[in-house]
Curated annotation (Swiss-Prot):
Extracellular-facing ranges: 50-83, 133-163
Subunit structure: Homodimer and heterodimers.
Keywords: Cell membrane, Glycoprotein, Membrane, Transmembrane, Transmembrane helix
Protein's name in the database: CASP-like protein 1E1
Sugar attachment sites: 67
Family indicated by similarity: Belongs to the Casparian strip membrane proteins (CASP) family.
Record topology, Cytoplasmic segments: 1-28, 105-111, 185-190
GO CC terms of this entry: plasma membrane; plasmodesma
GO molecular function: protein histidine kinase binding
Length: 190
């Protein structure tokens, strides 16, 4: 009798362990899909951000201003190109890691767990650094810099600046999702 109840308890514990493992895997898969969507959206929003405006330039105070058509594009600023590239790399990595998680079906070796953990950690570093770079340039565009005589450009290119700000915010959220994935990965290590 005692042996049977022990088996039942062990059986219940085993089923409970499977449920926790399945729900943890489901959480991981959901977070990876979320990271995939966030990085794809962030790269796309900033990649297509473009605005053209006619800007009056006054060359000589006595003459009327000269109207010049000016375009703001993400490809004109290296920090924005870096942000787009970082999001594209993270998106590609996430697609690969989703396939690995789905194929492994809970049978991941320690070396595979470590590889995914290191990959996730690299994405955290990459995305946080690109967020910082793009955010710094975005703030410079929004507020200018009086010390070096850089003028605000977001007053002219408001739509472009807003798209850049949205992309940077989405990248920051994706960075946090990857950071949470690192924590989940670390909890799986034996």
């Amino acid at each position: 009798m005692e042996h049977e109840s022990k088996n039942k308890v062990d059986g219940m514990e085993m089923e409970k362990g499977k449920k926790e493992s399945g729900s943890r895997k489901g959480l991981e898969l959901t977070m990876r899909v979320l990271a995939l969507v966030l990085t794809m959206v962030a790269a796309t929003v900033l990649g297509v951000a473009k605005q053209t405006k006619v800007v009056p330039i006054k060359l000589i105070p006595t003459l009327p201003p000269l109207n010049v058509s000016t375009t703001a594009k993400a490809s004109y600023l290296s920090a924005f190109v870096y942000n787009i590239s970082a999001n594209a790399i993270a998106c590609g990595y996430t697609a690969i890691s989703i396939v690995i998680v789905m194929i492994s079906k809970g049978k991941r070796s320690k070396s595979l767990l470590m590889a995914v953990l290191i990959g996730d950690l690299m994405m955290v570093a990459l995305l946080f650094s690109s967020t910082g770079a793009a955010g710094a340039i975005g703030l410079m565009g929004r507020h200018g810099n009086k010390h070096v005589m850089w003028k605000k450009v977001c007053g002219v290119f408001g739509k472009f600046c807003n798209q850049a700000a949205v992309s940077v915010a989405i990248t920051l959220i994706a960075s946090v999702v990857f950071m949470l994935l690192v924590v989940l990965d670390a909890l799986k290590l034996p």
